[in-house]
């Protein structure tokens, strides 16, 4: 078992891979960050990379020389199978934290050969790092990623999954979070709540996550869209996400639609004004999130 290190590991999709909030958190905590985010990935693929539902391979021969062997094809297999029987698609948008990886005790590189994430002709291959004896894999065998083997015992693990789907229902999503917590040897864990959607559309999700994880679940939507009222105590004049950046509520056009920040705040929706698009954060918003998370961690006696 790995010993806990003075570092932070964050797991997620493009909202994590894009960094900013996690690097700000690590900076304030005085710790090294290991960013386990990859764009476009759903919850199941992230859980597989982390190792909680590990990717597996069977019925292949790893040659003695340094030659790639096919692990799975996009067209016929759909992706790589996991221990729990799901199909996942790692590396479609990169992911340096996957390699070097191991199949059994053979160290090598897992590669996606497609021209882009949508290339249905792409395949996943494994190439051993050094020559050695030919190995026949005739039992289900784990594919262990670099971060699974080496960055799964952090002082703090942050899990931020679900924006791209990859779960059947809330029970399934909760189970995946708990699997990640159980698999890692993190001293502390924070669960980030999705920032997209409105208060009404996210109510069931947020209520369930709070029930399961308590104060260690932090809803980014709730914080960023939290209303600030005027002197009458009734009129919405701003929200935390705007005020923390010193911004006044305004409007923003996106895809031909104009969004009014105060109208969005009234529904518990993060204003487009502090987003790059409809989901991803501006640089200022990333800083707000990282600073807020550090303060929340201090309140939880993590830092």
Where are the regions that the model predicts?
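A short beta-strand-loop structural module common to alpha/beta enzyme folds
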Residues: 30-47
């Amino acid at each position: 078992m790995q010993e806990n290190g003075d570092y932070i590991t964050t797991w997620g999709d493009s909202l994590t891979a894009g960094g900013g909030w996690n690097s700000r958190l690590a900076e304030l905590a005085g710790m090294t960050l290991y960013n386990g985010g990859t764009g476009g990935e759903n919850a199941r693929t992230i859980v597989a990379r982390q190792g909680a539902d590990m990717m597996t391979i069977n019925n292949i021969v790893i040659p003695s020389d340094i030659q790639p062997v096919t692990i799975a094809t996009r067209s016929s297999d759909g992706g790589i199978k996991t221990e729990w029987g799901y199909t996942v698609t790692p590396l479609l948008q990169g992911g340096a934290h996957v390699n070097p990886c191991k199949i059994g005790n053979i160290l090598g590189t897992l590669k996606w050969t497609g021209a882009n994430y949508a290339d249905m002709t792409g395949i996943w291959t494994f190439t051993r790092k050094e020559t050695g004896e030919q190995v026949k894999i005739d039992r289900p065998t784990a594919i262990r990623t670099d971060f699974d083997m080496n960055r799964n015992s952090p002082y703090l693990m942050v899990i931020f999954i679900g924006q791209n789907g990859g779960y059947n229902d809330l029970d399934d999503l909760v189970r995946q979070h708990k699997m990640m917590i159980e698999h890692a040897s993190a001293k502390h864990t924070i669960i980030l709540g999705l920032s997209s959607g409105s208060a009404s559309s996210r109510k069931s999700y947020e209520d369930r996550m709070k029930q399961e994880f308590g104060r260690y679940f932090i809803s980014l939507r709730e914080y960023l869209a939290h209303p600030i009222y005027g002197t009458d105590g009734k009129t919405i004049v701003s929200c935390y996400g705007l005020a923390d950046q010193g911004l006044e509520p305004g409007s923003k056009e996106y895809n031909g639609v104009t969004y009014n920040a105060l109208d969005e705040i009234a529904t518990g929706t993060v204003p487009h004004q502090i987003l790059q698009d409809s989901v991803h954060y501006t640089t200022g918003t990333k800083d707000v999130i990282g600073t807020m998370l550090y303060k929340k961690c201090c309140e939880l006696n993590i830092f």
